[in-house]
From Swiss-Prot:
Keywords, ordered alphabetically: Acyltransferase, Cytoplasm, Iron, Metal-binding, Transferase, tRNA processing
Enzyme nomenclature, EC number: 2.3.1.234
Protein name: tRNA N6-adenosine threonylcarbamoyltransferase
Major place of residence: cytoplasm
UniProt remark on cofactor binding: Binds 1 Fe(2+) ion per subunit.
Lineage of producing organism: Bacteria, Bacillati, Bacillota, Bacilli, Bacillales
Function summary: Required for the formation of a threonylcarbamoyl group on adenosine at position 37 (t(6)A37) in tRNAs that read codons beginning with adenine. Is involved in the transfer of the threonylcarbamoyl moiety of threonylcarbamoyl-AMP (TC-AMP) to the N6 group of A37, together with TsaE and TsaB. TsaD likely plays a direct catalytic role in this reaction.
Intracellular or extracellular location(s): Cytoplasm
An example molecular function term from Gene Ontology annotations: N(6)-L-threonylcarbamoyladenine synthase activity
UniProt: substrate binding residues: V142, V143, S144, G145, G146, D175, G188, D192, N281
Cofactor: Fe(2+)
Similarity comment text for this entry: Belongs to the KAE1 / TsaD family.
Source organism (scientific name): Bacillus cereus (strain ATCC 10987 / NRS 248)
One of the record's GO cellular component terms: cytoplasm
Pfam family, any one: TsaD
């Protein structure tokens, strides 16, 4: 008997085009990846030192049909097997989002398949459900190029932002510091690698803000790094880039881990989930593991590297919950670059 008598499997097709990855995935029951195809554009944006929205949109137009067909082929299914289509409706670059949203609407209309809109950050959080079943209440530390926030969830589909950045996101600070150190885009992995070769010997600020605040601020730290480099150049002093990278990374991680740990205690959560592109950072992963190893009642979940950066499996995972909760989008669904996760 066993697990095979379960009710019909829920098959969700996920589509993600919020920034510079064109991604389509097929996920079963919100937890099992059947296909996960990602076409990255990093090479196209590298020489500009960041994502160029116009170029990103053009690439999505070129790639979306190919990636969609590849995902269906990899999953060995047809459109008839799909219960719903989940697509990132925001936040992100409006031109990029539009490609995914319109592709999803076209397929939904042509094949009469239900449509679900997904918040990009909800996707990052639900990437963790592809690793392990989530337990509530939980806290998610979301760290990416555009977002740095602590999100409290008391149940599926309920998101309360208890802390967020007041200026730069952590990933943004990484990219800007990398540029100051003449490193290629995206800067995060380069700084992470370099930081492991150096020592955090340079005194850099940590923005703790008010004693009871779970908010973040990285603009002061970013400016301090840039000023340190400029001052050293003016004085003709040599600063070891690996030490600067290590000092910067330690400053960022100190604040992220301390605030996540404090919030986990205050909200009495069962799990802490790491989410977002910067979740791939080895230094951050190691520090979180060390911190939460000391807490007996809190389980830390860290997704594999392939599920940290933008992908569509996470959108399908979040979309499964929305679909099962009866949420549906109409064909009037539009890209919403400023979409609020708490809405």
């Amino acid at each position: 008997m066993g697990e095979y008598i379960m009710e019909k499997n829920t098959i969700i097709l996920g589509i993600e085009t919020s920034c510079d990855e064109t991604a389509v995935a097929v996920v079963k029951n919100g937890t099992e990846i059947i296909a996960n195809v990602v076409a990255s554009q990093i090479e196209s944006h590298k020489r500009f030192g960041g994502v160029v929205p116009e170029i990103a949109s053009r690439h999505h137009v070129e790639e979306i049909t190919v990636v969609l067909e590849e995902a269906l082929k990899e999953a060995n299914i047809t459109f008839d097997d799909i219960d719903a289509i989940a697509v990132t409706e925001g936040p992100g670059l409006v031109g990029a989002l539009l490609i995914g949203v319109n592709a999803a609407k076209a397929v939904a209309f042509a094949h009469d398949i239900p449509l679900v809109g997904v918040h990009h950050i909800a996707g990052h959080i639900y990437a963790n459900r592809l690793v392990k079943e989530v337990q509530f209440p939980l806290l998610s530390l979301v760290v990416s190029g555009g977002h740095t926030e602590l999100v409290y969830m008391k149940e599926h589909g309920s998101f309360e932002v208890i802390g967020e950045t007041r200026d730069d996101a952590a990933g943004e600070a990484y990219d800007k510091v990398a540029r100051t150190l003449s490193m290629p885009y995206p800067g995060g992995p380069h700084i992470d690698r370099l930081a492991h070769e150096g020592e955090p010997t340079i005194d850099l600020p940590r923005a703790w803000l008010e004693p009871d605040s779970y908010d973040f601020s990285f603009s002061g730290l970013k400016s301090a790094v840039i000023n340190t480099v400029h001052n050293a150049k003016q004085r003709g002093i040599e600063i070891a880039p690996e030490d600067l990278a290590a000092s910067f990374q330690e400053s960022v991680i100190d604040v992220l881990v301390t605030k996540a740990s404090r919030a986990a205690d205050a909200y009495n959560v069962k799990q802490v989930l790491l989410a977002g592109g910067v979740a791939a950072n080895k230094g951050l992963r190691a520090r979180l593991e060390a911190e939460f190893a000391q807490k007996e009642n809190v389980e830390l979940i860290i997704p594999p590297l392939s599920l940290c950066t933008d992908n569509a499996a996470m959108i399908a995972a979040a979309g499964t919950i929305a679909y099962e909760q009866g949420k549906r989008a109409t064909l009037a669904l539009n890209a919403n670059p400023g979409l609020d996760i708490e809405a």
